[in-house]
Amino acid sequence: MMGTFTFLGTGTSQGVPMPACSCHVCHSKDPRDKRLRSSGLIRLADLTLCIDAGPDFRYQMLREKVNTLNAIVFTHEHRDHIAGIDDIRAYNYINNQVMPLFAPKEVVEALHQSYPYIFNSNYPGIPKVVLNEISEESFNIEGLTLTPIPVWHHKLRVFGYRFGDLAYITDAKTVPDSSRRLIRNIPTLIINCLHESPHISHFNLSEALAFVADINPGITYLTHISHLFGTHEEISAKLPPNVHAAYDGLALSFNTHVSDNL
């Protein structure tokens, strides 16, 4: 079965443009240089789910005309990936549904700490959720199998996800060999690449390209991009033919079937 992955956002935690910044990237007229906080949308015939729900979640759902949302899967607990959770109320009201959330233990704990009113009260109008804690084992959401890909964001564990022949990894600095084996030779790889300078918790360009060389994917898209990296055109000029800078709204096709070669 074929599905579609759409980049809801491809920016860093501050987004692009960044408030008060006078750089040429933040003032670019190219729509590809308008980067909301990083997240993704998976669409199959009878399934729509998000990876992360950051502070731009509401606008991203409006932009992509997401009228039905079956679940949200979280990568980690940083605010640029969870801060939009309150806006799931629209789906509670309009679709008369409780929203399933899938998250590793650290995210489950952070959601309880950051949004106690969701879990500790019956106040009218609060988001209605079912919080499912996931491990590093594969799990299934209405027929789609997702395999967590544990990576390290400095000292913070983050889950990337493989679904079919596509892997999505954000906020990675170190990727263990056990995780690399899950995605080696995958047809489509999405990874974070902040900019060219070294960073404590994100791949820079040289690290991202070294990772690509090791994984040997068919094609790679870079996400979680900083304004310090340059404009979309400037970034693209620095990349080899099989690596591309993603941009908000870009849609990719993927096959839910996993090849025996993976």
Model-identified regions with their sequence ranges:
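Core dinuclear metal-dependent hydrolase active-site scaffold
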Residues: 1-51, 55-64, 130-181, 248-262
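Glycine/Thr-rich phosphate-binding loops of Rossmann-like dinucleotide-binding domains
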Residues: 15, 59, 82-83, 199, ...
